[in-house]
Design a protein with these regions (language model features):
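N-terminal Sec-pathway targeting helices
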Residues: 1-15
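Short loop/beta submotifs within extracellular cysteine-rich repeat domains
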Residues: 51-53, 86, 107-109, 135-137, ...
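Extended surface/linker regions that mediate inter-domain or inter-protein docking
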Residues: 20-21, 25, 156-160
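Short sequence/structural segments immediately N-terminal
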Residues: 4-5, 34-38, 70-72, 156
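Gly/Gly-Pro-rich "capping" loops immediately C-terminal to redox-active cysteine motifs
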Residues: 57-122, 143-149
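C-terminal capping alpha-helices of c-type cytochrome domains
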Residues: 40, 119-136, 140-166
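Electrostatic cytochrome c docking/interface patches
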Residues: 25-69
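Detector for the c-type heme attachment site
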Residues: 46-49, 77-84, 162-163
């Protein structure tokens, strides 16, 4: 009797999980992220869906469509609605400090390890999005995806990061 109850409960949890995975894209704005967003950049930042209605493929070393989908695939999932990031607790209670990615922050000089680092250019921001490499050659932390985005998509995201700075 106990085994049958556990089996029924297990199947019920499985069904709830599958229903959740299938319906979440529609809740956040359609299966293609097509809710009302004022710009392509806002849509990508908020949902992860690019100009063709698909989530851009992640590059090796990042997440994206693979295991990372369990953690989310949109910038907002880690960097928050305002782009300021902050402390994020992930699965297994692991916490990371997520950086502020507003344009004003990325393009301003800052102190790092006692040295002043120059602000990033638009092409350096694009490179970090695509390859996960900072202008100084250091790799971004592993949770940060490396996205195979079109020039239009990257430009739209950078423009949206500028909007977050206002």
């Amino acid at each position: 009797m106990k085994n049958k109850t556990l089996l029924v409960m297990g199947l019920a949890l499985l069904v709830v999980g599958v229903v959740g995975i299938v319906t979440v894209p529609y809740i956040i704005g359609g299966a293609d992220g097509s809710a009302d967003y004022s710009t392509l950049g806002e849509r990508i930042y908020s949902t992860g869906y690019g100009e063709n209605g698909q989530i851009p493929r992640s590059m090796p070393g990042g997440r994206g469509r693979g295991a990372g989908m369990m953690m989310g695939a949109a910038c907002v999932d880690c960097h928050r609605e305002d782009g300021r990031g902050g402390r994020l607790t992930m699965m297994m209670r692991q916490s990371i400090d997520v950086p502020d990615i507003r344009y004003s922050t990325l393009t301003s000089s800052h102190d790092e390890n006692g040295e002043t680092e120059p602000g990033w250019t638009d092409s350096e921001i694009a490179e970090a999005i695509r390859t996960g490499v900072e202008p100084n050659g250091e790799q971004l932390r592993a949770p940060m995806p490396r996205w195979d985005m079109t020039n239009t998509e990257v430009d739209a995201v950078i423009t949206y990061l500028e909007e977050l700075s206002k």
